[in-house]
């Protein structure tokens, strides 16, 4: 958001990030992003716009989330090595609507709108030394798929990308900006 020259306040949201096992690919971050928005929704006030996001890496029908330790991070990077995977990011926009209902005892309701973006990323073959170096230096335990495209691994491993670079970073800013213009018009 700072790169868009827009004022914002970051908030920590304590949300359950588990999801139903039947969800696949882009449905997973969609579900989690909305769960984050719903967790914070009681704190929203009229005129506020909450933006939540979630990103996953999808490889061969499997979701790669954030690794818990070095062993799991190395296994993820070995799996990505020499292959094409998808990065899905869902972004949810939450705001108070003006509609009131007798069913909600005249409480204001929250409107949620979610977009999902997908980028195909191809990795070069990685050596064990490269994987070990990256994990020890960059500690990618807070990153889906155990990598940050903006870090060293992105420079040496990402050989091809179809879609938004910013989506791979975890926030598809072009699509978010387009949505923000829509919200500005309706305000």
How should each PLM-predicted stretch be described?
Residues 1-4, 20, 43-44:
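Short loop/helix-cap segments at secondary-structure boundaries that form the rim of catalytic
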Residues 10-15, 52-55:
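Short, conserved active-site loops that position catalytic residues or coordinate cofactors/metal ions
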Residues 12-20, 154-157:
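A short small-residue
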Residues 24-187:
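Anionic-ligand binding patches
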